[in-house]
Amino acid sequence: MIGRLQGILLEKQPPEILLDVHGIGYELLLPMTSFYNLPEIGQETVLFTHLVVREDAHLLFGFSAKTDRTLFRELIKTNGVGPKLALAILSAMSVNEFAYAIEHEELSKLVKIPGVGKKTAERLLVELKGKFKGIKQPDFFVESSHVGAVDPVTTSPEVPAEEAVAALMALGYKASDAEKMVKRIAKPHLTSEQLIREALKAAL
C-alpha cells in the first residue's frame, strides 16, 4: 500500500491534485482541511496517503497530517460511511472540530455535512465516541469555534467562485446549494480555496 508521497505539485483543482514523484504523476483526492496547506504549484510537498481499491477504480486519498489520515480510516470503518463521505466530513471539519462534535454529541453540526443524515450522524456518535485517544492532539477537544483557522497558500484562479462551486459539488453538495453557499460569502479578493473554506465554515 502507498502510505506516503513526496513530490512536486503539478496541478490543483479542489479536491484533486496531481503530484509528480520521480516522473510519475499521482492523482490524489484531498479533504479541504489538507488542501489549504498545499504549497504553490511547482513546489515540493509531502502527503500521507490511503489507497482505496474498487472494482471500477483505484482512488488515492492524500492528507497533510497523519491525524487526518487516521480519522479518515476510522470514518470508513463506520457502517454507511464510504471514502467520498469521509472526504466531505474532513473537508467540513478539522480533526479537532470533529472530535469535539463527537465527544459532545453535537448531532446538529454533523447533519449539516452533505451526505450525513440523522441516522448516519447517530451511528458516528455511537461508533466513534471514545476512539480518539490514538489521534489526540494538544488542543484536540477545543470547541470548534475556538480552533484557529489555517491560512491557505493558494494560486489566484480566474474564476474563483465557479471553482469553489465545482469543489463543493465534488464534496457532495447539490449545485443549487453550492451556488447559494458561495454567493453568500463571495468577495472579489477571495481565492477559490478561501471561498470554499468560508462557505464550509458558514454551513456549520
From Swiss-Prot:
Cellular compartments annotated: Cytoplasm
InterPro entries (UniProt xref): DNA_helicase_Holl-junc_RuvA_I, Hlx-hairpin-Hlx_DNA-bd_motif, NA-bd_OB-fold, RuvA, RuvA_2-like, RuvA_C, RuvA_C_sf
Gene Ontology MF, one: four-way junction helicase activity
One Gene Ontology term, aspect cellular component: Holliday junction helicase complex
Highest taxon of the lineage: Bacteria
Family: Belongs to the RuvA family.
Entry domain remark: Has three domains with a flexible linker between the domains II and III and assumes an 'L' shape. Domain III is highly mobile and contacts RuvB.
Subunit structure: Homotetramer. Forms an RuvA(8)-RuvB(12)-Holliday junction (HJ) complex. HJ DNA is sandwiched between 2 RuvA tetramers; dsDNA enters through RuvA and exits via RuvB. An RuvB hexamer assembles on each DNA strand where it exits the tetramer. Each RuvB hexamer is contacted by two RuvA subunits (via domain III) on 2 adjacent RuvB subunits; this complex drives branch migration. In the full resolvosome a probable DNA-RuvA(4)-RuvB(12)-RuvC(2) complex forms which resolves the HJ.
Name of this protein: Holliday junction branch migration complex subunit RuvA
Upper taxonomic lineage: Bacteria, Pseudomonadati, Pseudomonadota, Gammaproteobacteria, Pasteurellales
